[in-house]
């Protein structure tokens, strides 16, 4: 099978997204590499739990890993967010943690407002609406 060397899957959930993703992060990275993907984004639901395993697997097979998450603001539709650099990763961790602290660690709902997302530096944290203008930062 011919690989898709310029293709990057930018929204992929692992088995850490309960009832949404079924594969282990390592399996997803391995499959993406075997298909010849340029990159793979792990975007679990309100969690970065699959990122460490995915990072180790991506390093092993030589595929670029994009770190992200799906957040569910209480006043807006779900958003896919990607970290474009180390600061973006820190922002994403902070955003997810603040949602947990507001809610009290319930996995059912996170108390993240759309304004919480907007408060972060857009050069570090991208939403799906912004990705077309910033793909160089991701890939």
Per-range role (PLM):
Residues 1-139:
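Phosphodiester-processing cores and adjacent nucleic acid-binding clamps
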